[in-house]
Amino acid sequence: MSATDVVCDASVALKWFHSAGEEEVDSARGLLDRYRERAVALEVLDLTPYEVGNALLRGGPGVPAHLVAVVLEALAEICPQLAPTTSELRDAALLAERHGLTLYDAAYAAVAQARGARLATLDRQLLDNGLGRRPSAILEDLG
């Protein structure tokens, strides 16, 4: 059986490193477990480290910069970072316009769609527009 491709957005990748006050932590980390078992192939976009780092530095956690650097190094070791192609960015712009998304959120959806992957997200707009699935739903699908 081949691994299921899963693109994780920053809302999911953040849970791999930070749990206080976060939802779906166990499910997000469950995707990592399935990755280690080679049941899924996890990928993030090249913009994910910026989003995760910013959330840790400027968000609720207020994590010191030296620890954010450690997290970003760990993220780079966990899974590949994908750079969207020009075509995928074009699709992202169309999705952003159609669904009222930010371009960077739409980029996750466009890359996942173009590459035949599932998008793991906790972003309300992506979920409401059917562009991604919660980590718990993806784990459920995997059985």
Show which residues each predicted segment covers:
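Acidic, PIN/NYN-like endoribonuclease modules and their adjacent C-terminal/linker elements
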Residues: 1-5, 82, 109-143
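Alpha-helix capping/helix-boundary segments
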Residues: 12-13, 48, 88, 108, ...
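Residues that scaffold the ATP/ADP-binding catalytic core of kinase and kinase-like folds
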Residues: 15-17, 55, 129-130
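A general structural signal for well-ordered alpha-helical segments in protein cores
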Residues: 25-29, 49, 53, 68-72, ...
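Glycine/charged-rich beta-loop-alpha catalytic/anionic-binding loops adjacent to active sites
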Residues: 33-37, 73-76, 91-94
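Active-site-proximal, substrate-binding regions of enzyme catalytic domains
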Residues: 51-79
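Active-site neighborhoods of divalent-metal-dependent phosphate/nucleic-acid chemistry enzymes
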Residues: 79-118, 122
